[in-house]
UniProtKB/Swiss-Prot annotation:
Name of the protein this chain belongs to: YcgL domain-containing protein VS_0884
Xref: InterPro entries: YcgL-like_sf, YcgL_dom
PROSITE patterns xrefs: YCGL
Source organism of the structure: Vibrio atlanticus (strain LGP32)
Stored PANTHER family: PROTEIN YCGL (PTHR38109:SF1)
Gene3D superfamilies reported for this sequence: YcgL domain
All copies of domain YcgL, residue ranges: 1-84
Disulfide bridge partners, by residue number: none
Amino acid sequence: MLCSIYKSSKKEGTYLYIPKKDDFSQVPDALMQMFGKPSFVMVIKMDGRKLAQVNIDKVRESLNTDGFFLQVPPPPVNELELHKERKAQQNVQDEE
């Protein structure tokens, strides 16, 4: 199975996977509006391959059921909240 990958012109780190190059007919209009102008990245062979950011089985399933897969970046890490949590844990340990 081949898959074409496009990156979003509006949302950094967002990628759209579709089964046929330049065929966005299965992608909802609202999603295309949010995605912006797709910029072609590459075509990949899905068989026997791993992807860095997403589970390839989820991509395959979505391509087969929905006709596309949308990869969004993970949410940013809130360093301030992490620091507060570490500090609170440290204070609890110091009290023990």
